[in-house]
Structure formats: structure tokens, C-alpha cells
Design a protein with these regions (language model features):
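Active-site region of glycoside hydrolase catalytic domains
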Residues: 1-78, 121-123, 132-493
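Active-site mouth loops of central-metabolism enzymes
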Residues: 79-93, 170-172
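Catalytic domains of carbohydrate-active enzymes, especially glycoside hydrolases
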Residues: 93-114, 318-324
Length: 493
């Protein structure tokens, strides 16, 4: 047996890309509800209004500072298309979708709760009962099929009211608001949910500060404060979760990429080292329990003030994450030299193409060894249980006239990734809890806002402008993954 009997198999989704029902059931707006569609070459945009009535849209550029014009606040503006408003309509299709997951044999279903569906303004004293009831129905449906939920509390869904009133996570008010929200849902769903993640890809605070922290001014200091406030909030939620139910386990979620030097020049290796430090800073704090010296020296050099409190660091040290989960799709090649071909894509921008690997239409290299590298790196550094909670292939699938979708390219990608995981476990001794692919069912691409960049095992009839029946069609990969799960990863043919 390649994986232990308790190994969990499933798929992952996010409310802002999948759920829909953006103005139903008492839900308030969140950060992504004002984010337009885009493409591989056209960035998504945050739409805004000013008090004088002026409107506009600011491109969301990954890996760079983001700032709205002075006086602008995020808002829905006529004439723009917002793909998150409907997603692929899990809100009305949850029974059908969970049944499809059960047919594949899912042990686990990773989903996020829409914070503003529970607390429309993010910090309301009392919860929205319709929102609580919706997730009750979802978790009950999961329970009916023996599927365990893995719930992300915040997957880029910062309530818009907290952004417009406080400027997002740079303000310490959001610590208390998030803990209040977590307290409500952890008490309400006690016995239905025991696995929780606090913040999706917490290092998005650096890579995409509007998405990761609801920051409308993504300056270095605001990003540093936003990260610190999320670390403190996470520690408080770990403490709270254990008090509410000793069976609760709260994990970190990190966006991981392997970094390779383009040459053997030591300066290329130093560039790789710095890139890894920028990424692993977030897990050094949230999972490791302490601020690393390299980041403290950076803040000192740059004159960054965190607006912190002395007790913050005691909390961070005492209540680190119980386990470390992560997303991993690809690897990056870095150099201080010129190169013939630059890499493209929102997660590989700034690097160069790897001559040993093929890339997909969105510029992401297909790396068959990246998960083994990631798992060993994180296990050796932290020695805490690991969980791969996002890993998949985005592609423009074709729905045939007979309703079939032949996605051998996805099967080939996932086969290589599972083999890589297996080597990390059986050869290297990594403690791996489970695997949830991205994604269970087609949804809106976070990076580009497209539908044509599909990840799921189930095709959803919806296009880039929101047209389509929303009918579900299992792909070839659906039946392949069912076989993989049934064999606990032994049958990958």
C-alpha cells in the first residue's frame, strides 16, 4: 500500500469562485464581488467609486503593489462583468455536486465559507441565520455520504464593508472581527466540521494584497501589518478552536512553489534563497511560531512599523497551526542573468522558462517532481503533518456532442503529481494527511476570472461571460480519479 489507510482523497473549491448567490440569502458583498473577469493577457480589475460619483477600474497585477486612486472605494459599477456573482452556482446545485463527489469516492471536500454570508458586514454582532442554514444543509449533505468537510474560513472573501471602513487587514479591528466570526461558526458547526484552515494562501498578502488582505493600498508597511494581523488572528483561532472542541484541528494554508536557479552562478542561488525566504516567512511564523531574523532585519532596514502588541508574539509562539496545508501547481526558474525566454502566468511572472519542462497555455510549467520537492522541504523544516489541498491542471476542455470530455492531459498531470507524493511518503518518510485536487468541479479561475481555464473533474456548461445551462458533465478524469481513490492511489493507469 503506497499511502496509509487513513489517507484522505478529495477535491477543493472556493466560495468566491464556485458558490454564487452573491446577493441571495442575506449575504453581504466581499472583496471578489467587485472583481471583473480577465484573461491570460488581460488582468482582472477592481472596480470603484468616489464620493463625487466618479467610477473606474484598477488592474489587479500579481506580484506588485496595488493601490486604488485616492478617495476610491471598491464597488459594483454598471457595465462590468463580475464572474463571482454566479460562480458555477454551488448555492443552488450543492446536492447534485456533493452527490457527484460521493460517486468519485471523496473522503474529504475542501470548501470555503463566505464570511459575508455569515456576517454581512464582517463584524455584525449577530449572524445571518440564512447563511448559517445554508452551510448546515451543505455539511448535512456531506455527512449523508460520509464526506468530511475541510473548511477554509477566509479564501479571499474579506467582507467589503471591512475594506471600505477599515482599509482591510492592515487594521487590527479585523483581528477581533475574524475571531468573532470563527467563534460563531466553530460553535454552530461543532460536530459537523473538525478540520479548519484560517486563511487561504496566506502569503497572498505579499503576492496579491487586495485578494489576500483586502488592501486597497498595498504598500510594504500595509502588507506587513496585514500579515501580522492575520498571524495574530490565526493564533487566537487555534486557541479558540481547541477550547470549543478538542477534536478541532486548525491548519495553515500556504501557496508553495519550488524555485530553481537558472545557472550555477552563486548570485542565482542567492536569488532563489531570497524567493524561498519571502514565501516561507509566512509558514515560519504561522506554523513555526516565530518571526525569522531575515524578515525582522528587512523591516528594520525599511522602517516598517507593525502596530503590534507585546502579547502578539506570545500568542504566535503558543498557538501555531496544528498542520500545514499548501497549494502547489508548478515551479519557477530564477536568474540574475538574461535568458532567451521569460516565463508568463500570474504565478511564474518574473522568472524564466524551464528548458526541461513543458508549459500550459497560461504559462505554468508542468513539473512532475514539484510535489516531492515541496513535501520534503516543508516536512524537513517544520516536522508537522502536511496536507496537499490544491494541485491541478487548468485547461480549455472541449465538451463533445455526446456530453463527454476527454481530458487525458489532466489525467497525465495528476498521475505524475500523485506519483511524486507517493515517493515523498514511501521513500522520504513525509507525514502526509491527504490530497484535495484543484478543483472538484469546474469553477471560475481566480487568477484570470475565466471559465475556459478549467480544473475540475466535472465540466460545467458556462462560458467566460456567464452564459450556459450550468449543467454538469463528468469528464474522463472523473472516472479515472474514482479508480485512484478506490485503490488508495495504487491504480494510476
Amino acid at each position: 500500500m503506497s499511502f496509509k489507510n487513513s489517507f484522505t482523497w478529495g477535491g477543493a473549491t472556493a466560495a468566491n469562485q464556485y458558490e454564487g448567490g452573491y446577493d441571495e440569502g442575506g449575504k453581504g458583498l466581499n472583496a471578489v464581488d467587485v472583481l471583473t473577469n480577465g484573461s491570460a493577457t488581460e488582468p482582472r480589475k477592481v472596480t470603484w467609486k468616489k464620493p463625487n460619483g466618479e467610477t473606474g477600474a484598477t488592474p489587479l497585477v500579481w506580484g506588485k503593489e496595488f493601490k486604488l486612486p485616492e478617495g476610491a472605494i471598491p464597488a459594483i459599477v454598471d457595465g462590468y462583468y463580475y464572474p463571482s456573482h454566479q460562480g458555477t452556482d454551488f448555492y443552488h446545485h450543492y446536492k447534485e455536486d456533493i452527490k457527484l463527489m460521493a460517486e468519485m469516492g471523496f473522503d474529504i471536500f475542501r470548501l470555503s465559507m463566505n464570511w459575508s454570508r455569515i456576517l454581512p458586514n464582517g463584524d455584525d454582532k449577530l449572524p445571518n441565520e440564512e447563511g448559517l442554514a445554508f452551510y448546515d444543509k451543505v455539511f448535512d449533505e456531506c455527512g449523508k455520504y460520509g464526506i468530511e468537510p475541510l473548511v477554509t474560513l477566509s479564501h479571499y472573501e474579506t467582507p467589503l464593508s471591512l475594506i471600505t471602513r477599515f482599509g482591510g487587514w492592515k487594521d487590527r479591528h479585523l483581528i477581533d472581527a475574524f475571531v468573532h466570526y470563527s467563534d460563531i461558526v466553530m460553535n454552530h458547526y461543532k460536530g459537523k466540521v473538525r478540520y479548519w484552515l484560517t486563511f487561504n494562501e496566506i502569503n497572498a498578502m505579499d503576492m496579491a494584497p487586495y485578494m489576500g488582505g483586502g488592501l486597497i493600498d498595498g504598500s510594504e508597511e500595509n502588507r506587513a501589518r496585514g500579515a501580522h494581523n492575520q498571524f495574530v488572528a490565526s493564533a487566537k483561532v487555534v486557541k479558540l478552536a481547541h477550547q470549543i472542541d478538542p477534536n478541532n484541528r486548525v491548519g495553515q494554508m500556504l501557496a508553495y512553489s519550488a524555485f530553481y536557479p537558472y545557472t550555477c552562478d552563486p548570485k542565482d542561488q542567492l536569488k532563489v534563497m531570497k524567493a524561498k525566504q519571502e514565501m516561507l516567512f509566512f509558514s515560519d511564523v504561522q506554523t513555526g511560531g516565530r518571526y525569522p531574523d531575515y524578515r525582522l532585519k528587512q523591516y528594520e532596514r525599511d522602517g516598517i512599523e507593525l502596530n503590534d502588541k507585546a502579547e502578539d508574539y506570545d500568542l504566535i509562539a503558543k498557538y501555531p497551526a496544528d498542520f500545514l496545508s499548501f497549494s502547489c501547481y508548478t515551479s519557477n526558474v530564477l536568474t540574475t542573468h538574461g535568458a532567451d525566454a521569460k516565463a508568463s502566468g500570474n504565478v511564474t511572472a518574473g522568472g524564466v522558462k524551464n528548458p526541461y519542462l513543458k508549459s500550459n497555455a497560461w504559462g505554468w510549467a508542468t513539473d512532475p517532481d514539484v510535489l516531492r520537492i515541496a513535501l520534503n522541504d516543508l516536512w524537513d523544516r517544520y516536522h508537522k503533518p502536511l496536507w496537499v489541498v490544491e494541485n491541478g491542471l487548468g485547461s480549455a476542455d472541449t465538451l463533445e456532442k455526446d456530453g463527454s470530455v476527454h481530458d487525458d492531459y489532466r489525467i497525465n498531470y495528476l498521475r505524475s503529481q500523485i506519483k511524486s507524493m507517493c515517493d515523498a511518503v514511501t521513500i522520504d518518510g513525509v507525514d502526509l494527511m491527504g490530497y484535495t485536487t484543484w478543483s472538484a468541479i469546474d469553477l471560475v479561475s481566480n487568477g484570470t476570472g475565466e471559465m475556459k481555464k478549467r480544473y475540475g473533474f466535472v465540466y460545467v456548461d458556462r462560458d467566460d461571460r456567464g452564459h450556459g445551462s450550468l449543467k454538469r458533465y463528468p469528464k474522463d478524469s472523473f472516472y479515472w480519479y474514482k479508480k485512484v481513490i478506490a485503490s488508495n492511489g495504487d491504480d494510476l493507469d
